[in-house]
Structure formats: structure tokens, C-alpha cells
Design a protein with these regions (language model features):
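Class I SAM-dependent methyltransferase SAM/SAH-binding core
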Residues: 28-84
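C-terminal alpha-helical "lid/dimerization" subdomain adjacent to the S-adenosyl-L-methionine
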Residues: 128-179
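A conserved beta-strand element that flanks and buttresses the S-adenosyl-L-methionine
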Residues: 95-98
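Short glycine-dipeptide loop
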Residues: 121-127
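Conserved alpha-helix/loop element of class I SAM-dependent methyltransferases that forms part
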Residues: 7-27, 38
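Core SAM-dependent methyltransferase catalytic element
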Residues: 173-203
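A short, conserved alpha-helix within the catalytic core of class I
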Residues: 103-116
Length: 203
């Protein structure tokens, strides 16, 4: 991750992504799309962390790396589906680091992912993260090669993802939206969630 962030995407982890992760971290936090669990190794011991991923192996690996004592819940769930009612209004912060560019479809089809996450936030909670852009940025040769391979294999679906498109879907569900592009990565935060009509699902 560190090599590609620095050399392919122009957004070094320790200089940009990790500070962004820690800046918005709340006491009761949900990390969606857990990856390797790298960011979780840096959270304070006092933090309550819950994990969400469709892949149970990823949940277990990230939990082990972060330290089981920090992990409150491990939730296997499809982010395109509404969350169980028990999760609504529960979290001070929710992170999505390198999740959105891996989800199928264009940026507008990912709006429901933002909506579902917003339901799980407290009224003053913050949704934040980072995603690799395909549109409106200039990729270097290494980045172009990875973009081509990953999109062809279905690992990424982000050739048309833009900062403007991301801002739009965040603004559909939040009053306060901030974005910052570093290299070909956009870091974002969103708070002041709009009123959302609940969708009823089985817990």
C-alpha cells in the first residue's frame, strides 16, 4: 500500500492519509472496507472500533492486526444494502478508505453507500475517507498501468470517478462537505447529515 500510494497515486500514506484518518476519528468508530487494518493500528487504546466488510477473512485479519481488545463489533455486510436498525445513529465517525473506487458502478450509483453509512452516524458524526480518482486528475505512467489493470480485472471501478461527482453524492446526504485532492487521491469529510427516512431491514 505504501509503495503504490507514494509512487502511483502521489498520496503518501504517513504524510497525508494517516493524518486524515486520525483527524476525524471519534470515540466510537466504524471502519468500512477494512483492507489490511493498517490505520487501525494507530488508533488510541481508548477508542471503540467496529469493523464492516463483506469479506469475513478481511474482518478477522484486520481485527487481529489492530488488536482484538480494541474491536467492539465485526460486521459482515454489503454496503449497498441498508444497515440493520441496531446500527442506526450509533457511531461518532465512519471511515471509508479506498472503498469507493473498488465498488462496482459509476460514482452516482455509489450514492446509496453514502446514504446507508449516514444512517449509522450520530447527528453530529462525521463520515470521511479517501478514494482514487479516474477523471479530472493526471495519472503518471505507473498509476495509468495500475488503473488499466485494476479496472480490467474489476478490482477498481473508477475510470469516471471525479472530485465533483464525489462532492455531489456526499452533498445529497450531508450539509458540510470538504474535499482535498492530493496526487490522484481525493480525501473527504462530511458532517451535518440530512434527515434520512429509515429503511426497514431485519436485524
Amino acid at each position: 500500500m505504501g509503495v503504490s500510494n507514494r509512487l502511483a497515486w502521489g498520496c503518501p500514506t504517513k504524510e497525508h492519509l494517516l493524518p486524515h484518518f486520525l483527524e476525524h476519528l471519534g470515540n466510537n468508530h466504524l471502519d468500512i472496507g477494512v483492507g489490511t487494518g493498517f490505520y487501525l493500528t494507530h488508533v488510541p487504546e481508548s477508542s471503540l472500533i467496529s469493523l464492516m466488510d463483506l469479506n469475513e477473512a478481511s474482518l478477522n485479519a484486520a481485527s487481529t492486526r489492530a488488536g482484538e481488545s480494541k474491536i467492539k463489533h465485526k460486521i459482515s455486510h454489503d454496503v449497498f444494502d441498508p444497515y440493520p436498525a441496531a446500527l442506526h445513529g450509533q457511531f461518532d465517525s465512519i471511515s471509508m478508505f479506498y472503498l469507493l473506487h473498488c465498488l462496482p458502478g459509476n460514482i452516482s450509483t455509489k450514492s446509496c453507500v453514502i446514504r446507508n453509512a449516514a444512517q449509522a452516524l450520530t447527528d453530529d458524526g462525521t463520515l470521511y475517507g479517501a478514494t482514487i480518482l479516474g477523471d479530472g486528475v493526471v495519472h503518471n505512467s505507473f498509476g495509468q498501468k495500475l488503473m488499466r489493470i485494476y479496472n480490467q480485472k474489476g478490482i477498481f471501478s473508477n475510470t469516471k470517478d471525479s472530485e465533483e461527482g464525489l462532492t455531489h453524492i456526499l452533498s445529497e446526504h450531508f450539509e458540510n462537505v470538504k474535499t482535498k485532492v492530493q496526487g490522484t487521491v481525493v480525501m473527504f469529510s462530511a458532517s451535518g447529515k440530512n434527515s434520512i427516512q429509515p429503511q426497514h431491514v431485519l436485524a
